Amino acid sequence: MMGINSVYSKPISEIEFASAMNSVKNRFGVDENEWYIYLESEDYIYDQRLIEKGMEPKHSDTHRKFPKIIKNGQIDIDNIGDDFMLPDPIALIKEWQSSPNSWEKKVVSVMKTLGDFKNVIKILDIGSSNDCINPVSSGLTRPLEGREKIVSDIVQNLISRMSTIDTTDKNKSRQYQQEINTIVATYNSFHPVWSFVKLSKLNYWSKEIEVPFIRKGNRAINDINVNLRPSEDLKVSPTDKQFSQGYIPYLINKMVLGDIPNEIAAIVFNNTIVIDGLNLSEGQRLRAVLLSGNSRDSFDNRCIFKCKHFLENFFRENTIKEYNYTRYVKISIPK
């Protein structure tokens, strides 16, 4: 036990860090101003120490032989062969409310190659024949079948309701807020929740294919929650209707190619209504579900800040320069 403790408790020297940075720069071609090099260099050092003690590396992309990092916003999976083996096999899960207190789950696909992933996205891009409102939208962005008209009515009614809110009366304002929260929850219930899950993370966590939430009471303690809304001109968007452009598709592409922190075990998202003051827009709720150890009891809070830093940089780098990403992205971590 003392051996493994010394891997993490021993301070990192300047020489050690400089050597690690050179190794990372040579492999990935990144410069010293990028966030990635600092995280990867630290992970590289811990893995070097593990290797010296005869243990398997488990932190760095370098020692785990993950593919070369690709710049954010510049991933074109169409230029990568379909036979590319995913660094982590990925499962796609669909969950939905069948009644107010009942949920159903379906494992849509288990993807081992990039071709598997492309085929799943292609199949989901085929619009439902009953979907008259969005006939070419992806299944990853549509409401549950038959709920399209109800969802549209909810949004219009909520817009009308918010226009009557008196923000100067605190009692009425609190009452309105509770009412609006109920309406938003109803809207959410008419949309499926989609999850992309790394199967390697489930080998020790669960015999079932499921999202590896760790809960205390009814609250998850191992996820970073992100509310995403589009800009009025739609130049900034969580996703387009075809699930080909936007924050979420780009993040899923990075996950599939192994270009996200190892601690992100799943990416979960669903349609929601994002409210900012008296303004509302149809957006997305995204959750990055984190695991840092080899059991469900070994979650390390330190990885929350590492992954939050990664997400902040991802959203910043995937927002066009004229726009401040913080207007459209709200990140919160477990309390």
Curated annotation (Swiss-Prot):
Domain of life: Viruses
Name recorded for this polypeptide: Uncharacterized protein R257
Organism, as annotated: Acanthamoeba polyphaga mimivirus
